Curated annotation (Swiss-Prot):
The lineage of its organism: Bacteria, Pseudomonadati, Pseudomonadota, Gammaproteobacteria, Enterobacterales. InterPro entries: Homeodomain-like_sf (IPR009057), Transposase_8 (IPR002514), WH-like_DNA-bd_sf (IPR036388). Coiled coil: none annotated. GO terms for biological process: DNA transposition. It holds the Pfam family HTH_Tnp_1. Belongs to the transposase 8 family. GO terms for molecular function: DNA binding; transposase activity. It comes from Shigella flexneri. Gene3D superfamilies: Winged helix-like DNA-binding domain superfamily/Winged helix DNA-binding domain. This is Insertion element IS629 uncharacterized 12 kDa protein S4062. Keywords: Transposable element.
Length: 108
């Protein structure tokens, strides 16, 4: 059974800072992460993801989306869904009123 622990942004930043400051003491970044993760109380993989995200946010890393870009993308996708829903409602209303007008003209 896994436990979900939410860490505050300060704890996350401190953990990433500890990894970055301690890299010279270990053979690899993964070794650094594996030694620091138990001290923080998270899994090494969770800490690795945080370090990678920090690297992307500060201009390094593998070219993934920064946190701000990810947030903006999420907002744009939400807006896109709402606009599609609105267009669908307008399309259905237009069809309904066109049919009503056609029926009115036909009955004359």
């Amino acid at each position: 059974m896994t436990k979900n622990t939410r860490f505050s942004p300060e704890v996350r930043q401190r953990a990433v800072r500890m990894v970055l400051e301690s890299q010279g003491e270990y053979d690899s970044q993964w070794a650094t992460i594996c030694s620091i993760a138990p001290k923080i109380g998270c899994t090494p993989e969770t800490l690795r993801v945080r370090v990678r995200q920090h690297e992307r946010d500060t201009g390094g890393g593998d070219g993934g989306l920064t946190t701000a870009e990810r947030q903006r993308l999420k907002e744009l996708e939400r807006e896109n869904r709402e606009l599609r829903r609105s267009n669908d409602i307008l399309r259905q209303a237009s069809a309904y009123f066109a049919k009503a007008e056609f029926d009115r003209l036909w009955k004359k």
